[in-house]
Amino acid sequence: MHRYFSLAGRTALVTGGSRGIGRMIAQGLLEAGARVFICGRDGAACEATAAELSQYGECIGLAADLSGEVGARALAVELNKRIEQLDILVNNAGTSWGAPLESYPVKGWEKVMQLNVTAVFSCIQQLLPLLRKSGNEQNPARVINIGSVAGISSMSEEAYAYGPSKAALHQLSRNLARELVGEHINVNVIAPGRFPSKMTRFISNDEAAMAADVALIPMKRWGREEEMSALAITLCSAAGAYMTGAIIPIDGGFTL
């Protein structure tokens, strides 16, 4: 691997890293040489995924419920027992909720906003001391927040809270990028379009729905796992050291 993209000696945390986009990113960071912690509410699933990913490098699974501030604080306590500094934080954990507009529940709205925005803020807040220990002018610490093209476009698919939550996350990320750049912490957003995941399985398992969905994408296909991994590696390595505050769609041209 070219030195511009090497993550040798770096330590990363990927929330929601046991499946989907989180797993894609975790594998990519491992392949680039990083030591990677993955966390999620299902500790057994995280440990199982970590065992599978350990063929690519050192991967550790942790149980962490990030739906509230208490969980973020507990995760920070656990990491402080294990590491001296955190070089890379990928906030991938999130959720969605779909229902017709007339019956869309307030509890669904609040859950999506809590997990997709507030929990990310709490996680960054609690892990900031470890990130500060890492960042320097030559090699800043990196925070990647996983947004969505739903936060850029206006297609809601009856997931009325999801797009607004991701738009809020995009703006929060820009605010934090400005706030933390002087402390050598870069904050960027990856805004995925369609990639294989549990959240998109209802489309990929339906041949007609898949054909209709792909027709909306200029490249006429969904994203591949290695394409997500490669973008994350770029942002976390020397290749992305001069980037902060960016909202990067990876969507096959969907938002053009």
Q: What is each residue range found by the language model?
A:
Residues 100-101, 105-110, 213:
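Substrate-binding pocket helix/loop in short-chain dehydrogenase/reductase
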Residues 241-255:
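Short-chain dehydrogenase/reductase
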Residues 148:
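Residue(s) in the substrate-gating loop at a strand-loop-helix junction
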Residues 181, 186, 243-245:
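Short, small/polar-rich loop/turn modules that mediate ligand/substrate recognition or access, typified
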Residues 18-19, 42:
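Conserved glycine-rich cofactor-binding loop
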Residues 129, 178-179, 241:
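Alpha-helical segment proximal to the catalytic Tyr-Lys
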Residues 124, 165, 173:
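Active-site helix of classical SDR
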